[in-house]
Amino acid sequence: MAVSLEITERAIKDFQRIQEYMISAKKENAMETYEKLKSDYISTKALLNVAGVNLSELDIIKE
């Protein structure tokens, strides 16, 4: 059970970091970078949904 919790915690941190980078990329008009990050964003979001994490407050981008 502890391993599952560690994986979820890591995924949450990754999700937050990815969103920060996406926001920065969008501000800098780095759309190619934004699209690559968006792929990671979608994958991590799907993983967190499967893990049952409520993303309503964590998801800033909401795409």
Where in the sequence are the language-model features?
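Short, charge-rich amphipathic interface segments used for partner binding and complex assembly
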Residues: I7-R10, R17-E63
